[in-house]
Regions:
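Extended, well-ordered protein cores
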Residues: 1-11, 21, 163-164, 241
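Beta-sheet entry/capping signal
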Residues: 6, 144-145, 152-156, 230-235, ...
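Extended active-site and interfacial segments that coordinate phosphate-rich ligands
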Residues: 11-35
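Extended, charge-enriched "interface" segments that sit outside catalytic cores
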Residues: 41-226
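Short catalytic-loop micro-motif centered on adjacent basic/acidic residues
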Residues: 131-134, 233-237
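Conserved short loop/turn motifs at secondary-structure junctions
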Residues: 159-163, 234-242
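A short acidic (Asp/Glu
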Residues: 168, 243-251
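Secondary-structure transition/capping motifs at alpha-helix termini
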Residues: 225-231, 253-260
Length: 260
């Protein structure tokens, strides 16, 4: 996300990087769940399950018809393994949704890491309530901690840009004579009024560097829509000398729909 002074870091590169890290994170998480699934052969003939887990498995079976019938027969009395299998399916659906740019489907794929963690915690709590402490506090707990740390996005991306890049855009789209030469206080007053009045500008005629800056904000908005707010949480403005340097970025973010 660091494009400060680097012309090669475009909106497309940022999007590609996010897609790559999310794909990697989901692939690793699926592998972890498959390993966990092999350990969860606990039968209800020996160890029970909470009503919450049983209800969750029933809901999974309703929304995931792709469950192989042989697994349903073999694991009919193994709710923990069925739940782990459902999680693998939902992770695969999440990966496919991201690849296609399709909308989230509740109970089919995961909207965010919190939904995945809720499923894992449900399994852990059920195991703890039914003499399954060994696996609940072992491999399952380690899996929960790993996913809580990295999420299904692998990492939160920071985006960084030089303050001059934002003022360059505003010089072009506002058409204000001598904009760059104005003092920090003058720019701050102008920009805060733009924000307060929700002024919209035509960004279609920007020169290449200005378009690159605006495209970055559009890409951030799209990535947050696709991967959730945890995908990108921080935008860093370098070489700031006044409050106007920060407000300038916010005005452009407003044009991209990031700020209402």
């Amino acid at each position: 996300g660091d494009r400060d002074g680097n012309p090669n870091i475009t909106a497309e590169i940022t999007t590609d990087a996010m897609e790559l890290q999310v794909s990697h994170a989901i692939r690793v998480t699926i592998a972890a769940m498959n390993a966990l699934r092999q350990m969860l052969s606990v039968s209800t003939k020996i160890v029970g399950a909470t009503p919450e887990l049983s209800a969750s498995v029933e809901k999974d079976l309703k929304h995931i018809p792709e469950f192989e019938q042989r697994f349903l027969r073999l694991n009919a009395e193994e709710p923990y393994r069925l739940k782990a299998t459902a999680i693998v399916h939902r992770l695969a659906f999440t990966r496919d949704r991201h690849a296609k740019g399709a909308p989230h489907v509740p109970n089919r794929d995961y909207a965010n890491t919190a939904e995945l963690l809720a499923d894992l915690v449900l399994m852990r709590d059920s195991l703890l309530a039914h003499r399954g402490e060994l696996i609940a506090t072992g491999l399952l707990e380690r899996t929960i901690r790993t996913i809580a740390a990295f999420g299904i996005n692998h990492a939160t991306m920071d985006v960084r840009e030089h303050s001059d890049a934002h003022h360059n855009v505003l010089k072009q789209i506002t058409g204000i004579d001598g904009y760059i030469e104005k003092s920090h206080d003058e720019k701050f007053e102008i920009l805060t009024k733009f924000l307060a009045d929700d002024v919209r500008f035509d960004t279609s005629q920007l020169e290449a560097l200005g378009k690159k800056t605006v495209d970055t904000f559009v890409a951030i908005n799209n990535l947050i829509d696709r991967f959730g707010p945890e995908a990108i949480e921080t935008y860093i403005v370098s070489m700031t000398k006044g409050a106007d340097d920060l407000i300038a970025a916010v005005v452009i973010a407003q044009q991209a729909g990031l700020v209402s």
